[in-house]
Amino acid sequence: MYKTKGGFQLTLQTLSLVVGFMAWSIIAPLMPFIKQDVNVTEGQISIILAIPVILGSVLRVPFGYLTNIVGAKWVFFTSFIVLLFPIFFLGQAQTPGMLMASGFFLGVGGAIFSVGVTSVPKYFPKEKVGLANGIYGMGNIGTAVSSFLAPPIAGIIGWQTTVRSYLIIIALFALIMFIFGDTQERKIKVPLMAQMKTLSKNYKLYYLSYWYFITFGAFVAFGIFLPNYLVNHFGIDKVDAGIRSGVFIALATFLRPIGGILGDKFNAVKVLMIDFVIMIIGAVILGISDHIALFTVGCLTISICAGIGNGLIFKLVPSYFSNEAGSANGIVSMMGGLGGFFPPLVITYVANLTGSSHLAFIFLAVFGCIALFTMRHLYQKEYGSLKHS
């Protein structure tokens, strides 16, 4: 089963996540083109870029729960059908309001993340769950696909036509999921309120949510603000900015399975502590950098640590919450998504207030330091002293 049905469903769901994230992230790499045709202020741009994260985060909880009730096939299929509408209207957008409304419903593409992290572990033994979820998480590469491909294509055929071309891809995957999705997936029908009551009493859920708020939040936030930030702050060409942003996203995505593998082989909490120490260093580098070379080093450091951290955290979630996996996955992934909503707004606010965005990156380092204290607390409660482990 693990080599046949499980492998096939892992591949299918990973590719579906790629498509979902392509749609979810389509606005950010095209914003340098969009703002040439649509009259938007920098403040409106920061809101437009952040809006898809809202629904993409909040829906992760019900999507995770529904996956255990009806199976991944039907949640993916329905999501793709729904995504056709905001993609179509985004291609017609002529006002900031139309961009915001379309972007809000594009959040469905980000919400499907919790579908696979709930479904995929059912097909694999416990010692392979970290790797399997890490591979599924590579579907985040859809964000990089949009960052790499959308700007050069938009330069040739225009941003509206580029957006509308996504309709074909999404419709195709709706059909593929309808035909090949697993109708025999194991269902777990624990009442939602019973799950929530159990989860609310477990401090580990709060810790994992906070950690993922930082790691996945950094992944999403940097993917959102980098294209526009690089153009405005460093004067980089629009296509080059998209490529640089794509490198950040791709690196974090491809390292996610490495985090899962490390979590399978070593103590995941201990590895995560090391990961966060390095991430804090990267955030400090960003907080003091005015040169593109140093800024690049800081970004790549954050990318590496965010990718590995994402994989480590979703090794821990199913191991701590086997009976409430769907809801726990949804809550943790929701917090990760929300972690990507606030930073672009904070960066814009801090830049307007102080004339520089450096302080916003220092905030990331502070949040990371707080996370280290919570990791130490969990480790000592679960495994004993760090000195004797």
Curated annotation (Swiss-Prot):
Transmembrane segments: 14-34, 45-65, 69-89, 97-117, 139-159, 161-181, 211-231, 246-266, 268-288, 294-314, 331-351, 353-373
Induction statement: Positively regulated by the two-component system NreB/NreC.
Gene Ontology cellular component terms for the protein in this record: plasma membrane
GO MF terms held by the record: nitrate transmembrane transporter activity
Pfam families (UniProt xref): MFS_1
Keyword Membrane (UniProt): yes
Family, as annotated: Belongs to the major facilitator superfamily. Nitrate/nitrite porter (TC 2.A.1.8) family.
Protein known as: Probable nitrate transporter NarT
Species annotation: Staphylococcus aureus (strain MRSA252)
